């Protein structure tokens, strides 16, 4: 990709984030085009893509036959098909799996590294972009297209925008915002996704979890009314038979080192510590606080105390901005 990522700065929590423009280099774009695009995606992902309008984007899962997620996808309509954003570390294997049945359909599935992914968040993000685009997305219309640019709106943890655009527009936006906005890399966007409770599936956790173990049902990413798709039987069983015993949690606190994706944590049990959970993502903020996204049992006590393995510091549960009640 010719557009150079911005240098990293320590990320900031959403409540204190100044206006910030981010390069989302740890995320990647992919597309499906062709006459059978909608039908094909409908048979592959957990969401009901046939009901998606041009104004919507949503988080869906692409599962294996056992209902375990290869990846989750931030999906939106694009040209005569769809585009999606996922972690760069899982894009190649996810596309390999998605293409397995494509020979029988009129579709072209491909990575897209021509376009650039940017994020805008922080203080008065909307006002900063209002000078640069004729229309901005909102709750009512979450996707807006203008020329070569697609803008996606996010409500949590605070209003922010994901911009999919060409290199020329990315350079223009950088030049226009450089004076007033801080520049940062994708760690800041990752910190915001963790705060928002959006599950982050990197390569270490691909093929490990059913969608409900990462709260996808609470984020509107699973349709239980649509026709069949790969892994549907297991995903449905988890709902209707109560087979899912896990959930995604947000922990904050201190740690002398950041846990890596796929690592477990330790839960305090009286005087002892017991291993628990699987870390999806973790970030250290500029104030020294550590935020961790972890899949654990869904019946954790809200006052539970955790730590990174053998660490002297502790982590506690923070509420997510959505409810898991069905």
Swiss-Prot record:
Superkingdom: Bacteria
Localization of this protein: Cytoplasm
Family: Belongs to the tRNA-modifying YgfZ family.
Gene: ygfZ
Protein name: tRNA-modifying protein YgfZ
UniProt cross-references to PANTHER family, sorted A to Z: TRANSFERASE CAF17, MITOCHONDRIAL-RELATED
Organism whose genome encodes this protein: Escherichia coli O6:K15:H31 (strain 536 / UPEC)
SUPFAM superfamilies to which the protein is assigned, alphabetical: Aminomethyltransferase beta-barrel domain, Folate-binding domain
GO terms for MF: folic acid binding
Annotated transmembrane regions: none
Keyword Transport: no
